[in-house]
Structure formats: C-alpha cells, structure tokens
C-alpha cells in the first residue's frame, strides 16, 4: 500500500465503514459515506476533464464539504488548493490564477466574489456551489449535492507517493505561495502523530493501518478531533484533521463562523472529543471564559474525555496554558513550532511539567545558523536563523528563485529557512525570537516583536497585543505596542511601558502605546501586522 492520503483513507473506510468520520452540527457521515461521497466527487472532477495533478480550489468555510472535496481531489491524484475565505476579488483571482485552478468548490455566500472573477480565469472547467443560504450568484455553478448524486463512485486507483501535495501560505510575508511536498513524505509525517495520542506506536508501514484502526475502534479509543482553526490553514487542516483521520478517528467541525468558546466546549462535551486544535492565546482565552461562565451558572461542561490541546502558528504563553490546566487538569498541551515550510520543534506542558514561553525542544533535524554560516553554539547567546531539516518541501509552486533562497543545502543536507530567528540555550532548547521580516531596528538594536508582546501581555489589564515599528527620526524605528484591554481595565500608556521595562532591557520597551478595541488577527489567530502597523501610523499622524 502506498503512503498516500487517499489510499490510506480507503483502507480505513473498508475496515470501519460504519464508524463516524465527519460531524458538522447534526450531519454525521460514516467512513463509508465519506469515502463514497468523495469518490463521486472524484468521478465528477474527471468527467469535467480534470485528472492527475489538476488543481481543485476550496473556497470554503469549515465543514464536511471541505474534507469531502479534498478527499475527492486526492482520489483522482489531483491537488486540493486552500483558498482563504476572507479574500476579496483581486486576492481570490490572484490565488486561483497562480494555482492554475481547474475546479472551484465554494460556499454560496462567497459566490458574489466568485462571479466577479471567473471570466478572468480561463482554466476553470468546473464550479461547484455548496449551499449555505445565498445561492444562485454564479450562473455556471453546479450544486454540490446534485454533483454527488449525478455520478457513480470513481473506481479506485493505484497512486504514487511522488504525487504533489500543496498548501498555500497565508501571505504574511508577501503574496501567498503554494508550498509543494511529495505526498508520501507529507502523509508519513502525520501518520506518525495520531497513534501515540491513543497509546499505540505509529505504524512502520501503511499496510499496518487497518489492523491498528480496528484495535483502536474495538477498544473504544477513537481519536475525536475538533479543529477550531480554519481548515484553509495548515494548523486546522494538518493537526486538526489529518492526524485524526490517519488514525481512523473522526473530525468534528464547528458550525459557527467566528470562535465561540461555549460552542467549542459544548461540542467537545457532546462528541466526547479527545483533541482540540487551536491557535495560541487568542483562541484559548475564549475557552477559559466559557468554562468559567458555565461553572458560575451551575452547569459546568463535562470535558473528561478531552486529553490533548495542540496549538501552532503563534505565541501560546505559559500564563494562559496554566489557566487552561487549572480548569482541565488532565490535559497535555502541545505547542508546535513551525510553518508551512517546515517543522522546527515543540513544547509539552502538563500538570507537574512546567514550560517557558517561546522555549522549545528542537527536532533532531533542526539547526540554528548565523549570518556567516556557522551553527550557533548552545549557551552562546548568539542569534541565528532556524534551519528546519527532515520534513522539507520540494519548493514553491512557480517560484524557483524564492525556492532557492528558502530551501538550501548545508553539508549535503537540505534545510528550510522560513525566516524564524532563535537563540540556543545551554541545554540545546530553542529560544524563539520571531520572524526576521518583523524585526524592529531601533537605535541600532534589533527588537523582536514577539518578545515584547509576551512581556506586554503580562501587564495586568492587557488582553492582547501586537508590536510594530514606526518610523522615527531619532531611533530609525520606534517600538510601538498596539494594545487591547480587558473589560473594566484601568491601564494607561505609562503603566504598560513601565511594566515591560521591569521584564526586558529598556531599549525593547514600547516608546508608544496605541489602544484599540480589538487586536487585528486572521481567522486562524495569526497576527495581522499590516493592519496593526496602520493603526500605529495613524496614531502617529503618518499614512
């Protein structure tokens, strides 16, 4: 059996056809239904002229349809393409054009944007509309359920581990780029993650999967996962769905389109969830508030099934982790550090196992390299760029120059340099400083925003914070904190600056503080530094 998502999932569907694979609100799909519906979609794609390496774009909110359409693309050896549902016309057109998309599956509420760009996308052969109450805006679109009903399931294929898998970056460091992987490498990585979560060793070969899945199922120990982050980004999709489905588990997606802590906890309770995947403090705090509110009204949530919470992509502070453990003490909290371009390391926090914010155990294949090409010595206090080895992509789709800059060979080993900087502690752990393109140069000193954000959020009354640099005649750039406060907080600029100076060197402390009602973040919780910088510039009287 080849290591390929579609092939592994087909073997699971054959082994446990009647077990639930997908849940969205009241809609539940068994593994047999999941497999059959994806096979019908694959047949529809092929009937429209798509085939091996064809790109199927998914302009969808979280839900069963996202995963079914993705599986359908995998089945025909196509390439599913994630599309940010926040994109407006030009962003949408850019990504679909750049990806060479031949099919587009979209929620009808997003149809007005689709209608305005499709005439500029001559490669699009097929449009499939998922009805969410606002249909009929795209004349050429076929209804999702009609497409499934109109096609018999596609016969299963022999696939190659060399097939391309691709995920588009969020565009936080420029225009979105498609990061390409061998699907065999990608599936192998995530095949290794789900089984330890249910107490089993990972399979050494995909042919072992059906027997392991049967063992898990018979023991009543299936991995039920809730991705609270959007499936259009790697954290929600990879950690929230691939990990569970490769172990024969179920994925429960939320029906709300903005994060509601009560919905997350209620869904975890009702589905006996084992795993919740989220993104940092911004997604954890609403869960903590919801837990407390339910307890105060005398109707606490039963979260006894919950074993693990995984976060990736942004800062997850020690203080917030401890608050979560105070309420759900049996949890293992896994803070994974990495990017679309590669995995770097992780941090585990449990009751009795403390952790330090931004300090991670690095993967054995991770190095930190100085500007002159040396490996950073542990305990030296030198700063270097993180080089992630092991799981390294093929490159960026249609961008050989950026591929050559990002994916480099050192001493015969290929590494990914995504732009993250770190120090190496004496014990070999990584002290993450942040993304290099966000570094603030103030008075000749380099200031990493994440370090200042962490310190700012420790000041009583601060709910959230982003730190940016604003042009300054004296310092070049002035460190500026964009801050939102907790309800009823009585905190001013001087208190925040003083609070940071008690924790960090004076040159790192904000010189200005801009107060906003809410910190700008993407749906996956990642920082929107562009908007934060605009807030800071506006406050300083600059455009």
Model-identified regions with their sequence ranges:
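Conserved AMP-binding/adenylate-forming core of the ANL superfamily
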Residues: 18-63, 71, 88-93
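Structural core segment of the AMP-binding/adenylate-forming
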Residues: 47-48, 78-146, 158
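AMP-binding/adenylate-forming catalytic core of the ANL superfamily
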Residues: 87, 93-94, 102-106, 389, ...
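AMP-binding/adenylate-forming catalytic domain of the ANL superfamily
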Residues: 130, 505-527
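Conserved pre-ATP/AMP-binding loop-to-beta segment of ANL
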Residues: 150-168, 174-175, 198, 214-224
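Gly/Ser/Thr-rich phosphate-binding loop
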Residues: 171, 246-247, 273-278, 289-356, ...
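Conserved AMP-binding/adenylation subdomain of ANL enzymes
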Residues: 187-227, 232-277, 290, 294
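Conserved beta-loop-beta connector loops within the AMP-binding
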Residues: 367-387, 426-427, 489-493, 527-528
């Amino acid at each position: 059996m080849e290591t390929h998502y579609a092939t592994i999932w087909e073997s699971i569907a054959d082994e446990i056809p009647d077990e639930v694979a997908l849940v969205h609100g009241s809609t539940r799909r068994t593994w047999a239904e999941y497999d059959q519906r994806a096979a019908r979609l694959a047949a529809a794609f092929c009937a429209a002229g798509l085939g091996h390496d064809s790109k199927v774009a998914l302009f969808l909110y979280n839900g069963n349809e996202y995963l079914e359409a993705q599986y359908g693309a995998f089945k025909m050896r196509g390439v599913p393409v994630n599309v940010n549902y926040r994109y407006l016309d030009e962003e949408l057109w850019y990504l679909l054009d750049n990806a060479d998309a031949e099919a587009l599956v979209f929620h009808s509420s997003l149809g007005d944007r689709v209608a305005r760009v499709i005439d500029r996308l001559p490669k699009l052969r097929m449009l499939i509309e998922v009805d969410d109450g606002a249909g009929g805006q795209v004349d050429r679109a076929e209804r999702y359920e009609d497409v499934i009903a109109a096609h018999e399931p596609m016969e299963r294929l022999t696939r190659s581990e060399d097939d391309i898998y691709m995920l588009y970056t969020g565009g936080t460091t420029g225009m979105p780029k498609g990061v390409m992987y061998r699907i065999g490498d990608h599936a192998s990585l995530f095949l290794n993650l789900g089984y330890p979560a249910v107490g089993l060793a990972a399979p050494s070969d995909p042919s072992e999967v059906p027997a392991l899945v049967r063992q898990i199922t018979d023991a009543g120990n299936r991995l039920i996962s809730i991705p609270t982050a959007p499936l259009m980004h790697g954290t929600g999709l990879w950690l929230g769905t691939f990990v569970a489905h490769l172990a024969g588990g179920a994925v429960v997606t939320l029906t709300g389109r903005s994060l509601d802590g009560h919905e997350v906890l209620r869904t975890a309770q009702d589905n006996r969830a084992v795993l919740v995947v989220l993104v940092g403090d911004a997604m954890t705090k609403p869960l903590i508030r919801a837990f407390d509110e339910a307890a105060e009204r005398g109707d606490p949530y039963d979260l006894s099934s919950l074993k693990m919470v995984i976060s990736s992509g942004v800062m997850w502070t020690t203080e917030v982790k401890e608050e979560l453990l105070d309420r759900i003490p049996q949890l293992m909290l896994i803070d994974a550090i990495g990017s679309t371009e590669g995995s770097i390391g992780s941090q585990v926090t449990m009751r009795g196992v403390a952790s330090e914010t931004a300090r991670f155990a690095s993967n054995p294949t991770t190095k930190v390299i100085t500007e002159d090409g040396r490996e950073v010595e542990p305990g030296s206090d030198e700063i270097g760029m993180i080089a992630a080895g092991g799981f390294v992509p093929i490159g960026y789709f249609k961008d050989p120059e950026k591929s050559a800059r990002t994916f480099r060979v050192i001493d015969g080993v290929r590494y990914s340099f995504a732009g993250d900087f770190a120090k190496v502690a004496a014990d070999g752990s990584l002290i993450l400083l942040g993304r290099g393109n966000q570094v603030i140069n103030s008075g000749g000193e380099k200031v990493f925003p994440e370090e200042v954000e962490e310190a700012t959020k420790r000041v009583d009354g601060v709910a959230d914070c982003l730190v940016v640099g604003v042009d300054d005649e004296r310092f070049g750039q002035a460190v500026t904190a964009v801050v939102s406060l907790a309800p009823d907080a009585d905190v001013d600029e001087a208190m925040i600056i003083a609070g940071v100076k008690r924790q960090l060197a004076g040159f790192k402390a904000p010189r200005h503080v801009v107060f906003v009602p809410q910190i700008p973040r993407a749906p996956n919780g990642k920082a929107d530094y562009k908007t934060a910088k605009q807030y800071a510039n506006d406050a300083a009287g600059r455009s």
